[in-house]
């Protein structure tokens, strides 16, 4: 069966999310919190635990391990420069033909850290993902901020 998509423009095939997150924590603490939150402490919708494996080196995988050799590859680490950059490329949570790039750029700002987040994608982005992706990243990025700002135990 062949399905045509009349009237599909470039804007229907692209996705761009940009967010700035101001964190009251050092650059190093914020970067470590980012790796933790995107890895073992990741959460899905409604705050449910969804731990991920994040191999934080160039070419490292970022994936959800479901056990028994099952899982879902979200992407690969395209670039990492501790503690100022981590960049991913891959399908992320989308199980259809899409190329995504996710960037976290960190810089010192007023005694804290500024995270500049950017998710750009190209391909057959389903409408449900288009609607939910901004809020989803907002939740993840807020959890990164909360983790970085929490008091350190002695």
Language-model segments: residues:
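Short acidic N-proximal helix/loop "leader" segments that mark the beginning
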Residues: 1-18
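A conserved amphipathic terminal alpha-helix motif
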Residues: 1-3, 121-154
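Short beta-edge strand/loop motif at the mouth of beta-sheet-based domains
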Residues: 18, 25, 36-73, 83-85, ...
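Hydrophobic/aromatic beta-strand elements that line small-molecule binding cavities or substrate pockets
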Residues: 19-21, 74-79, 100-108
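Short glycine/serine/proline-enriched coil/turn segments at secondary-structure junctions
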Residues: 69, 94-98, 140
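Mid-chain, well-packed structural core segment of small domains
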Residues: 85-104
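Short, solvent-exposed aromatic-acidic interface loops
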Residues: 92-95, 118-124
């Amino acid at each position: 069966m062949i399905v045509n998509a009349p009237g599909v423009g470039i804007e229907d095939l692209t996705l761009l999310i940009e967010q700035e997150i101001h964190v009251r924590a050092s650059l190093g603490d914020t970067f470590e919190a980012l790796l933790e939150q995107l890895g073992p402490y990741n959460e899905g919708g409604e705050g449910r635990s969804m731990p991920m494996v994040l191999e934080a080196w160039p070419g490292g995988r970022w994936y959800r391990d479901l056990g028994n050799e099952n899982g879902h590859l979200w992407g690969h680490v395209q670039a990492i420069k501790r503690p100022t950059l981590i960049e991913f490329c891959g399908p992320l949570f989308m199980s259809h033909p899409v190329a995504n790039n996710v960037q976290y750029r960190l810089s010192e700002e007023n005694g804290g850290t500024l995270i500049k987040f950017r998710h750009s994608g190209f391909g057959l982005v389903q409408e449900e993902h288009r609607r939910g992706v901004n809020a989803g990243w907002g939740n993840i990025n807020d959890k990164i901020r909360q983790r970085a700002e929490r008091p350190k135990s002695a």
